[in-house]
Amino acid sequence: MRRFDTLFSQLQQKQQGAFVPFVTLCDPNLAQSFEIIQTLVENGADALELGFPFSDPMLDGPVIQAANQRALVAGCSTDASFQLLTQVRSTYPTLPISLLLCANLVYAQGIERFYQRCAEVGVDAVLIADLPLFAHREFTVMAEKYSIQQVFICPPNACEDTIKRVAQQTQGYTYLVSRSGVTGVENQQSADNLKTLVERLKAYQAPPILQGFGISQPQQVSDVLKIGVNGAISGSATVQIIEKYHHDPQACLAELAQFTQKMKQATT
């Protein structure tokens, strides 16, 4: 059984939701990034969603854009990101790991080579934020070849056909976006139709649903679980802690530990 499948099965038995933090690899630098990831996992993160530093990220608000810049200024490269992933996987052999990135980064490596490298370092799933449903085939063919689960986004304004196609094509989990726009904790509003979207996705037997965008408080985690999703992804709120404390590594790790514990507690 694949790692995400195993995770959701275990959480269902425990009657828990998943808490999945997002961070940018190598933010603020390679060494601190690994310590940050360790802290997240050791304090309750059920899985990780990780980004590769990129100069023009899609969907990212100012907080995650700044994280990309910190990593790039520190000299992080795609090779360094894969190196860090190797270290994470060797430390946590059962941890589900998903990548969230842009198509241009994949193209820069070559599609097949990118998925091959993902498989070599133990990545479980890949979500390409700017990959349209109608243009996914060359990516999903390579994902299947290297046993990588290709994840797709269900937007809040999805029509019935889009909901059906997302449910049928996404693997590992379904990424449900809380609202339109870019990531960020400033806008914590959610679309009014999310409960209906969850019901429709489940009607088409979509993989477990993780909701993301604007989730920064434990109460929000509890609230999204009540509408039937299987877990919550928190990116900007997690990265904001790194932004605030990256010059004080110990304070950064302490704040991240406390944040992760509270967010995970809200899934029970």
From Swiss-Prot:
Its EC number is 4.2.1.20. It comes from Pasteurella multocida (strain Pm70). It catalyses: (1S,2R)-1-C-(indol-3-yl)glycerol 3-phosphate + L-serine = D-glyceraldehyde 3-phosphate + L-tryptophan + H2O. The keyword Lyase applies. Pathway: Amino-acid biosynthesis; L-tryptophan biosynthesis; L-tryptophan from chorismate: step 5/5. The gene is trpA. It is an enzyme of class 4 (lyase). One of its GO terms (cellular component) is cytosol. InterPro entries: Aldolase_TIM, RibuloseP-bd_barrel, Trp_synthase_alpha_AS, Trp_synthase_suA. SUPFAM superfamilies: Ribulose-phoshate binding barrel. The active site is at 49 (proton acceptor), 60 (proton acceptor). Tetramer of two alpha and two beta chains. This is Tryptophan synthase alpha chain. Belongs to the TrpA family. The lineage of its organism: Bacteria, Pseudomonadati, Pseudomonadota, Gammaproteobacteria, Pasteurellales. The alpha subunit is responsible for the aldol cleavage of indoleglycerol phosphate to indole and glyceraldehyde 3-phosphate.
